[in-house]
């Protein structure tokens, strides 16, 4: 949802499943991804700016990792050159005592920006290595925003993979992240084919779902995306993450969805913990509030699991069974 404005998801939402159907769907997910005894991991999308909009440096990332360490050791970012992300993030990953890794992002638009992104990869990956680089995403919700046609995005995924794996010689998987409905609806098939992995983003808040429907909606959306990825790949053995999901804790309502700490906590416990128990790895959007994005007239600054001062909003340990 980085750089995402409040577009309407509601018309694209699948009908919520019954509780029994959701349980069956989640069981299918588990059998398709990991052994049933293996819980999915919790990771966080991490912004590269302070609350005032200034860029983070290595010490700032180290401080982020320290407060995130009880819950995860993996984060994802969205660009390599913006805020000189790689220059300061890669040393932090290497220095942190908590063994953090990252899924790095490459922003594929516009052409000049894209060139800067690749230059950052060429400069800093050889310098710092990839021991703490789990994967690379080329774009985030590029198809959803119509930033690039699917075939052009696929070409840029191949381009970055060639740069990283062939030219630089690093065995790092390359894929992308987009809204669940773009995968489920089939318009991203050529991108699925091009990708080593797929991330599916899903925000029931932006579908206007209330507390009665948010969990069922999230699980049914995720299953629909996963099934399409498996179909296109021709195998159930795919690398698939929930790339972004979360719930705002302040700001205006959207349809029947209210933005409160209590509902965000409920969404975490009911939807996210449920799907993790079935073996799906998730990236929570996001680690910290990003105050620089706006004010109380928007929910965009308030998706953090923690406030911008790095204090926790609600329990991030799964408690319900």
Swiss-Prot record:
Top enzyme category: hydrolase
Keywords from the UniProt entry: Cell wall, Glycoprotein, Glycosidase, Hydrolase, Secreted, Signal
GO function terms (MF aspect): glucan endo-1,3-beta-D-glucosidase activity; glucan exo-1,3-beta-glucosidase activity
Signal peptide: 1-21
EC numbers for this chain: 3.2.1.58
Superkingdom classification of source: Eukaryota
InterPro entries hit by this protein: Beta-glucan_modifiers, Glyco_hydro_17, Glycoside_hydrolase_SF
Reaction equation(s) it catalyzes: Successive hydrolysis of beta-D-glucose units from the non-reducing ends of (1->3)-beta-D-glucans, releasing alpha-glucose
Subcellular location(s) per record: Secreted, Cell wall
Main function: Glucanases possibly play a role in cell expansion during growth, in cell-cell fusion during mating, and in spore release during sporulation. This enzyme may be involved in beta-glucan degradation and also function biosynthetically as a transglycosylase.
Homology family: Belongs to the glycosyl hydrolase 17 family.
Name used for this protein in its record: Glucan 1,3-beta-glucosidase
Lineage: Eukaryota, Fungi, Dikarya, Ascomycota, Taphrinomycotina
Gene responsible for this protein: bgl2
């Amino acid at each position: 949802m980085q750089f995402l404005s409040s577009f309407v998801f509601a018309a694209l939402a699948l009908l919520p499943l019954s509780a029994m159907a959701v349980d069956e769907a989640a069981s299918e997910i588990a059998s398709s991804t990991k052994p049933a005894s293996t819980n999915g991991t919790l990771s966080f999308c991490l912004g590269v700016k302070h609350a005032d909009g200034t860029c983070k440096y290595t010490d700032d990332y180290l401080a982020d990792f320290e407060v995130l360490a009880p819950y995860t050791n993996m984060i994802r970012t969205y660009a390599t050159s913006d805020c000189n992300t790689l220059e300061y993030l890669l040393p932090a990953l290497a220095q942190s005592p908590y063994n953090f890794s990252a899924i790095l992002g490459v922003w594929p638009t516009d052409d000049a920006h894209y060139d800067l992104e690749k230059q950052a990869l060429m400069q800093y990956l050889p310098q710092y290595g990839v021991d703490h680089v789990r994967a690379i995403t080329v774009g985030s919700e590029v198809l959803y925003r119509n930033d690039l046609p699917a075939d052009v995005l696929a070409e840029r995924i191949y381009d970055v993979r060639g740069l990283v794996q062939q030219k630089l010689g690093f065995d790092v998987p390359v894929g992308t992240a987009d809204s669940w409905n773009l995968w489920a609806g089939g318009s991203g098939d050529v991108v699925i084919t091009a990708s080593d992995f797929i991330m599916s983003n899903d925000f029931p808040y932006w579908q206007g779902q209330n507390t009665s429907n948010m969990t069922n909606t999230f699980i049914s959306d995720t299953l629909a995306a996963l099934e399409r990825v498996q179909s296109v790949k021709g195998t159930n053995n795919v690398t698939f993450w929930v790339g972004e999901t979360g719930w705002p804790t302040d700001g205006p309502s959207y349809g029947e969805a209210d933005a409160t700490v209590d509902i965000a906590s409920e969404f975490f416990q009911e939807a996210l913990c449920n799907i993790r128990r079935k073996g799906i790895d998730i990236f929570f959007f996001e680690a910290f509030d990003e105050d620089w994005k706006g004010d109380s007239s928007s929910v965009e600054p308030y998706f953090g699991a923690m406030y911008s001062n790095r204090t926790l909003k609600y329990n991030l340990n799964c408690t319900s069974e």
